Regions:
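Extracellular/luminal low-complexity segments enriched in Ser/Thr/Pro
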Residues: 71, 95-110
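C-terminal edge beta-strand
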Residues: 129-137
Length: 453
């Protein structure tokens, strides 16, 4: 590990000796002896979260992830630190000088680890002092997720519940980090702090379920650098890497985006042949694969992509029409996802999400956000969709719309408010709910993702 060195000025200690002159046969007086100085030692005091700490019987200090540790030496010092296992401990908000070593401790693992802070006196390298900490296991929720965002990007979200902090890293490696906090008004929801949030109400939030995270974040507006808007995302740490496991029939919603324009897409798709083929029904009326006329079925080949869990698709009738998909696991259920740039002109940014088709429609209540920047509670029963959505300005929009049959061949696809002006489609699987605006109406391009508690 790299030492942190700091300059120091050595103190020079002098002693004066006296001499006497004899006269008349008198004797001379001897000089005073040089004083013997005690050997210097390097000592430290330790504080944890601002309070004095006492070492255990074995000379080590017990701390938990998220604690702020301060080590203060009695001599100006240079510093080094290490963890065992290597890399298991990271530091946040480090403040290191010749007179102090301070940082918040994060355990990057779900097991206990050891962390050592080593001081070496700047003026005398022979003087050293190790301060050893037993660091408790990190929170089991300290995980990283592959994120598929509705602005058409793929990112990585790392959450640390010990330090209540996050890092969101985009495809270029640009990382933004800050803190998050529990939402006191909605158990199980957490609020992202971000300098990108400028609205009166912060609707950048997330919720967790087994292997997955669903939320909203101030991502860059698609293809508009420097502009940000709160938009939904879904992330998973369980991505299907076995090709045959991709197989399934999915109801798939999507949006296409470029500056000033946004469109919706609603399709049923089927991955078949042990994950080697993707079938898509291109009928104007939304139609199941089973009921789709053969001339309206587009077939794509599927092969392994550039990274584990990414699968490349190529239209067998048009090699320039290609893309990528992934299947992620959310609480044990398969979810089809895609985010990126369309290879076909005009090269829209695209987002796709698909749930496994089912003959069952469930009564559910979810929490989630939409690409209007709202966050709220979303309810479905046999006949009605309801939502209480908090807008960025803090006002609440309450809606209650009737559900409609959207496709005779796809029972799990529902229409919302087909008798009204703002018309939507909905799907759900008991864990996720997704709503998309219908094409050619005022809410075209709308997308909402909710997670059932």
């Amino acid at each position: 590990m790299k030492w942190f060195y700091f300059s120091a000025t050595a103190a020079l200690v002098g002693a004066l000796g006296g001499c006497g002159g004899g006269g008349g046969g008198g004797g001379g007086g001897g000089g005073l002896p040089f004083p013997i100085l005690p050997a210097a030692t390097l000592g430290v005091t330790v504080q944890v979260n601002g309070s004095s700490a006492t070492a255990n019987g074995d000379g080590k200090y017990s701390i938990k992830p998220g604690d702020v540790v301060t080590v203060t030496p009695n001599l100006g010092s240079d510093w080094n630190s290490s963890s065992d296992p290597a890399g298991s401990v990271s530091l946040r908000n480090a403040d290191i000088s010749s007179t102090k070593w301070s940082a918040q401790i994060a355990n990057n693992t779900n097991a206990a680890s050891m962390f050592t802070v080593s001081a070496k006196a700047t003026a005398n390298a022979a003087l050293t002092k190790d301060t050893v900490f037993n660091v408790a296991a990190g929170d089991a929720r300290n995980l990283s997720y592959k994120v598929y965002a509705t602005n058409g990007s793929q990112q990585t979200l790392a959450l640390n519940f010990d330090t209540m902090s996050y890092v969101m890293t985009d495809e270029t490696g640009l990382a933004v980090s800050d803190s998050f906090s529990a939402d006191a008004a909605q158990t199980g929801t957490y609020v992202f702090k971000s300098s990108r949030n400028t609205a009166a109400t912060n609707n950048s939030r997330f919720r967790l379920i087994t292997d997955a995270v669903v939320g909203s974040f101030p991502f860059q507006v698609a293809q508009v650098p420097g502009s940000y808007a709160v938009q939904p995302f879904i992330g998973s740490r369980a991505i299907v890497t076995t090709q045959s496991a991709l197989d399934g029939i999915y109801i798939r919603f999507g949006i296409n985006m470029r500056p000033g324009l946004i469109d919706s897409q609603i399709r049923q798709v089927q991955v078949t042949g042990g994950g080697t083929s993707l079938l898509l029904c291109n009928e104007v009326a939304i139609t199941s694969i089973a009921a789709c006329p053969p001339t309206s079925i587009a077939t794509y080949s599927i092969s392994a992509g550039s990274s584990a869990g990414s699968w490349s698709t190529v239209n067998v009738a048009n090699a320039s029409d290609k893309g990528a998909l992934a299947v992620i696991m959310v609480d044990g259920k398969k979810v089809y996802v895609a985010a990126g740039i369309n290879s076909v002109a005009p090269n829209d940014s695209i987002f796709r999400i698909g749930l496994v088709d089912s003959s069952t429609w469930l009564n559910t209540t979810a929490r989630g956000g939409d690409n209007n920047g709202t966050w709220g509670t979303l309810g479905f029963d046999a006949t009605t969709y309801t939502a209480a959505l908090t807008k960025p300005d803090g006002t609440v929009s309450n809606v209650s719309y009737g559900l409609n049959v959207a496709s005779a061949s796809i029972p799990a696809l529902k229409g919302i408010n087909f008798a009204g002006t703002d018309r939507y489609f909905a799907m759900q699987d008991g864990t996720l709910s997704v709503v998309v605006g219908a094409r050619t109406n005022p809410v075209t391009g709308y997308l909402q993702i909710g997670l059932v508690p």
